[in-house]
Amino acid sequence: MKKVITTLLSLLLLGSPAIAQRIPVEGWYKMVSAEYGKSWRDSGKRTHFHSIKRFGEVSIFGEGFGFKGKSESEFGLTILDDNLSGSIVARFNWISEKNPLSGFEGHSRCEITAGSTICVMWFDGYGEFEGKILELSLNEKEQIDKENVSGFDLYMLEGLVMDEPSSAIPGGG
């Protein structure tokens, strides 16, 4: 009887949406243009920006998953010192090139050290990607010679795509 109960519990847990399939993905984000709003300096000589909007292209792929589209982002908190070290918190909307009613919305938290950027990003799918989530890291591609780059920044993306887990929070998604 103990074996039967153990087997049934195992099947129940393995079939549970709480253990969603996680597909490793990788790709690229290329910043094409930016609009900078007003900025100001604090007493520590760090620059704060009221608004930065960036536009770019994104491509992500993995086994049985692919996404290519346009990126629109708004940086809600940007603080940089004279050495280009600081923090950025941003919101993103990635719009599918196949269907503009589908894509991913999300946010990121980035740390910048001497101009080199590392971010953690979270996204929720909409349209044909409804019910999917992306959890990614963004790393600035080291091979780019910043002195000779004209017009764009290139970032490497790595992470997971999965089904959104069931909400355990009352009133949560």
Each PLM stretch: what is its role?
Residues 1-4:
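Positively charged n-region of N-terminal signal peptides that target proteins for export
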Residues 6-7, 25:
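Intrinsic disorder/low-complexity segments, especially N-terminal tails and targeting/processing regions
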Residues 7-15:
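Bacterial N-terminal signal peptides
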Residues 16-20:
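Sec/Tat signal peptide C-region and signal peptidase I cleavage site
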Residues 21-173:
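Beta-strand-enriched cores of mature, soluble protein domains
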